[in-house]
């Protein structure tokens, strides 16, 4: 399985995705496709075509490619999820692409590789957040988290409630809630390396690292501008 962490307009994903499409290896994008960092000097003119291409890849290979959503994607659908670097000049295009192709995206994914269960989200899942928002989510066992988040996303009647609780931001990200959501949770909130969801190893991005990924006992934060692979034994390797 190939893992593509936060893109933000970068091109590092293209070669590993192209190779994986040829070999049939599964691919998962962890979200945050747009809103590049100004200091990286990424031309914004190519971002809409890039997002269109990624969506096209998903349409062409629906069973092979998984597209997760991050906070920089969702804030084009709900202003309460607003974050930095919102691109007002291209917002109308992003809104259309995310809204009109919403069924191609999801909030979470899971897989079992090498005897290990993996849960993929944009920013990680805290047990405390699941309990904090159980009025909306219901009482969830670890094995129900992925399906419940995706159910709420794909059901247009439940989606507004999901977007409301996804706007939860903890103090680690200058928010006011006791827990961050799976698109806003900060790596500091996971820093104790607690086993938040027993039996699941969590993989996420969102918290950009200067150089190397953070790979712990119970989670891996891979937001470091490179692609990764989970091999058949369940080990994470940089590509």
Question: Which residues does each predicted region cover?
Answer:
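Active-site neighborhood of phospho(di)ester-bond hydrolases with catalytic His/Asp-centered motifs
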Residues: 4-5, 27-31, 66-71, 120-121, ...
């Amino acid at each position: 399985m190939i893992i593509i962490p936060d893109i933000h307009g970068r091109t590092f994903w293209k070669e590993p995705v192209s190779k994986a499409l040829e070999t049939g290896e599964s691919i998962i994008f962890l979200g945050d496709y747009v809103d590049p960092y100004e200091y990286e000097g990424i031309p914004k003119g190519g971002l809409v075509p890039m997002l269109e291409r990624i969506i096209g890849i998903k349409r062409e290979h629906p069973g092979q490619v998984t597209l997760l959503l991050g906070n920089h994607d969702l804030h084009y659908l709900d202003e309460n999820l607003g974050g930095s670097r919102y691109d007002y000049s291209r917002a109308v295009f992003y809104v259309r692409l995310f809204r009109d192709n919403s069924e191609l995206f999801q909030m979470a994914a899971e897989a079992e590789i090498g005897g290990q269960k993996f849960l993929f989200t944009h920013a990680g899942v805290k047990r405390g957040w699941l309990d904090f928002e159980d009025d909306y989510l219901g009482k969830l066992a670890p094995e129900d988290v992925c399906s419940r988040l995706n159910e709420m996303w794909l059901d247009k009647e439940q989606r507004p409630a999901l977007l409301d609780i996804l706007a939860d931001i903890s103090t680690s990200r200058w928010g006011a809630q006791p827990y961050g959501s799976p698109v806003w949770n900060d790596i500091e909130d996971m820093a104790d390396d607690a086993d938040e969801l027993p039996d699941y190893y969590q993989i996420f991005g969102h918290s950009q690292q200067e150089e190397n990924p953070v790979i712990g006992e119970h989670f891996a934060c891979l937001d470091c501008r490179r692609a990764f692979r989970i091999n058949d034994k369940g080990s994470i390797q940089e590509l």
